[in-house]
Amino acid sequence: MLTLKIAVYIVVAFFVTIFIFGFLSNDPARNPGRRDLE
């Protein structure tokens, strides 16, 4: 039961981190580094 709760917290933290990174990357400019990578 404890490992299940830890796994749930890890998954939630993972999605929250992805959401925060996506929001920060889209906030200042619209895709600033994509043309440099291509």
UniProtKB/Swiss-Prot annotation:
Pfam families linked to this entry: PsbI
Organism domain of life: Bacteria
GO biological process: photosynthesis
Cellular location(s): Cellular thylakoid membrane
UniProt keyword Membrane, yes or no: yes
GO cellular component: photosystem II reaction center; plasma membrane-derived thylakoid membrane
InterPro entries cross-referenced by the UniProt entry: PSII_PsbI, PSII_PsbI_sf
Primary location: membrane
Residues in the signal sequence: none
Topological relation to the membrane, as annotated: Single-pass membrane protein
Keywords annotated in UniProt: Membrane, Photosynthesis, Photosystem II, Reaction center, Thylakoid, Transmembrane, Transmembrane helix
UniProt KW Transmembrane keyword: yes
Membrane-traversing stretches: 4-24
Function: One of the components of the core complex of photosystem II (PSII), required for its stability and/or assembly. PSII is a light-driven water:plastoquinone oxidoreductase that uses light energy to abstract electrons from H(2)O, generating O(2) and a proton gradient subsequently used for ATP formation. It consists of a core antenna complex that captures photons, and an electron transfer chain that converts photonic excitation into a charge separation.
Sequence similarity: Belongs to the PsbI family.
Subunit composition and interactions: PSII is composed of 1 copy each of membrane proteins PsbA, PsbB, PsbC, PsbD, PsbE, PsbF, PsbH, PsbI, PsbJ, PsbK, PsbL, PsbM, PsbT, PsbX, PsbY, PsbZ, Psb30/Ycf12, peripheral proteins PsbO, CyanoQ (PsbQ), PsbU, PsbV and a large number of cofactors. It forms dimeric complexes.
Record's protein name: Photosystem II reaction center protein I
Organism: Nostoc punctiforme (strain ATCC 29133 / PCC 73102)
The organism's taxonomic lineage, starting at the top: Bacteria, Bacillati, Cyanobacteriota, Cyanophyceae, Nostocales
Record gene name: psbI
